[in-house]
């Protein structure tokens, strides 16, 4: 008879129960890492400095035996379950670690999605206010909103840099920039040229201004996915996200961002992110110290996908680091029965934030907690509203943004955005 299956989702619970049931780990062991590898099997990794310590070895063997008993196919035989490794290796695997018990941690080795495990400040100080336009699903108007926001901010005297980082589905630049105004190079060009030390040579030739911005007091610079000619776009795209021997992909993105900010000296940077839960999107949400506009529609599939992300932040103790930089956007708000739709949307957003990111107001130490009622104005779950209109429907040209059309669709959104900007994002406070 086959043993009952122990599914992947039960590993954490079983690891916690197994580790907490054992006697205390000897202090001489230092930190103990339970490493869940790419196959989902769990081994113990500790410093090779304790390899000859009999008391430490006995404690590790007890833990390895218990893990083998409770993890099923995700466990390994006791004799293969302990690895003595260098301190340098232990340091390299600590990103996203979760505490099982004092001095015992579970860590994951991943092919993708590892950038969702941390929420950090950039290694270089930024001067401009940054906003990431993100969604778990595509087709919700992020490109149009980036163009409208740039238009609005430039009309009010701001210098704006817009970066098209949706590199798998580029379209912002072609929608906003006329062919004769597109720059020689784009973001994909910088990433491949920077690999051979030529990044700074293309920075000055990879932004351009849309024609409609020339009459404004401010300025708009668009950094497109590719230049005037796309060239070998797929070959370049295949090299964009690679980690180098010196810098991982998020740090390379920081270098590009800082170089463009130094070149264009913007007041505001708008980052159009890739949609979905891939690492590529994670870097623009968690790693660039931007305020994140979360585009959503009132559909169960949207809320389900956002719950996956929010639950991950909650389970990995990242809620406090990320929640103050989030604002939900009601994208594609319908023309008819709008009030009822927005009520349902706000309730769905409140459920999402309340269940995963807001503090429990019933807790005795929650007097200063981060929590909001359903109808609190300007709370993270209180949506910035974009109304669907025929004038800004899919495929509409953004070469000539008409004030009347923008006002009809975006008046409420822009008013809320201005209040958000005046309040300042966490990185500006």
Regions found by a protein language model. Give the residues of each.
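Long, basic/Gly/Ser/Thr-rich N-terminal segments
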Residues: 1-110, 114
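Conserved catalytic-core segment of NTP-binding enzymes
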Residues: 10, 55-71, 88-90, 156, ...
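Beta-strand-loop-alpha "switch" segments that mediate conformational coupling across diverse proteins
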Residues: 37, 54, 78-87, 227, ...
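Pre-Walker A adenine-sensing motif
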Residues: 113-125
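Walker A/P-loop phosphate-binding motif and the immediately C-terminal alpha-helix
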Residues: 126-169
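Active-site signature of alpha/beta-hydrolase-fold catalytic machinery across serine-
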Residues: 148, 152, 175, 283
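P-loop/Walker-type NTP enzyme "switch/lid" segment
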Residues: 167-262
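C-terminal helical/tail subdomains of lipid-metabolizing enzymes
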Residues: 381-429
């Amino acid at each position: 008879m086959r043993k009952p299956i122990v599914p992947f989702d039960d590993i954490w619970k079983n690891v916690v129960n197994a580790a907490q049931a054992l006697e205390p780990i000897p202090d001489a062991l230092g930190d103990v890492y339970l490493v869940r590898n790419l196959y989902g099997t769990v081994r113990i990794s500790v410093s090779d400095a304790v390899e000859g310590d009999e008391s430490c070895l006995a404690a590790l063997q007890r833990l390895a035996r218990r893990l083998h008993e409770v993890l099923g196919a995700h466990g390994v035989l006791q004799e293969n379950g302990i690895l003595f490794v260098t301190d340098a290796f232990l340091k390299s695997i600590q990103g996203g670690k979760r505490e099982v018990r004092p001095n015992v941690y579970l860590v994951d080795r991943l092919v993708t999605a590892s950038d969702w495990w941390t929420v950090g400040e950039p290694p270089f100080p930024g001067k401009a206010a940054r906003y990431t336009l993100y969604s778990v699903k595509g087709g919700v108007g992020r490109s149009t909103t980036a163009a409208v926001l740039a238009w609005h901010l430039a009309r009010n005297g701001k210098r704006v840099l817009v970066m098209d980082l949706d590199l798998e589905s580029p379209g912002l630049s072609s929608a906003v920039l006329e062919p004769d105004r597109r720059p020689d190079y784009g973001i994909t060009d910088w990433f491949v040229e920077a690999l051979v030390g030529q990044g700074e040579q293309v920075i000055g030739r990879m932004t351009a201004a849309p024609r409609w911005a020339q009459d404004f007091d401010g300025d708009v610079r668009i950094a497109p996915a590719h230049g005037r000619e796309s060239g070998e776009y797929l070959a370049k795209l295949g090299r964009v996200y690679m980690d180098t021997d010196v810098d991982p992909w998020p740090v390379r993105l920081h270098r590009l961002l800082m170089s463009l900010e130094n070149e264009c000296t913007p007041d505001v940077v708008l980052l159009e992110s890739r949609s979905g839960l891939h690492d590529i999107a994670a870097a623009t949400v968690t790693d660039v110290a931007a305020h994140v506009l979360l585009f959503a529609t009132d559909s169960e599939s949207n809320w389900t996908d956002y719950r996956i992300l929010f639950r991950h932040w909650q389970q990995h103790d990242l809620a406090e680091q990320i929640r103050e930089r989030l604002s939900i956007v009601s994208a594609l708000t319908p023309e008819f029965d709008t009030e009822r739709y927005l009520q349902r949307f706000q309730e769905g957003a409140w459920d999402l934030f309340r269940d995963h990111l807001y503090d429990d107001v019933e807790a005795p130490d929650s007097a200063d907690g981060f929590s909001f009622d359903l109808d609190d104005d300007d709370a993270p779950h209180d949506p910035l509203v974009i109304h669907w209109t025929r004038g800004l429907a899919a495929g509409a040209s953004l070469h000539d943004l008409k004030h009347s059309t923008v006002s009809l669709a975006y008046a409420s959104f822009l008013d809320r955005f201005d209040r958000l900007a005046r309040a300042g994002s966490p990185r500006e406070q």
